[in-house]
Amino acid sequence: MTIYIATSNPGKLRDFAAAAAQDVGVAPLPGIKEIPAPAEDEPTFDGNARLKAIYYSHYASGEIVIADDSGLEVDALGGAPGVRSARYAEDKLFNGPSNATIDERNNLCLLEALCTMSVPHPTARYRCVLAAARDGEILATGDGTVDGQILSTPRGAKGFGYDPLFYLPQQNKTMAELDVQTKLAFSHRGRAFAALLKALLPQLQPPQIQ
């Protein structure tokens, strides 16, 4: 069985592929780069994940499509960037260096927001909510979180998003310093995907003949 992921983000696709259960394959939704993106205007991760799953499922008739909404919640910033994590620098009108990537600008914007606060080790969490839909109907959801701290300088090159700043004290490493399999054992996305599959797979089993 193949489940289609409504993302073209290579980092997310790599995480999902590594977390897939036995007999469950994952693949990017065909043609997703050409599909107009929906407005992610819900105030919660759950709302945006459901919105996207329903929307993209209409582009894959009869197939199961998974969408995620995930981000970083920093306690010292009142939970920001939150659902705006991917657009944090844009929202703050922060440009950064001209050659910086979107991820790099978001990271620099976060550090600038924290630099005026006397919080030596800002606590934070990654949060992910996944929703699975087929033909416009939600089949299951799953959520996962992981707690950590925000460093003042980035470390590691294996991750994406805020991974170079997100420090796991129990590992003495940032998310960006972990290999894919180790990361999945701790990551919000790996935990959310496991919860989603636990809720979804029983629904897909053929009924037993009495």
Q: Model-derived features: where do they sit?
A:
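Anionic-ligand binding patches
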Residues: 2-4, 10-28, 32-210
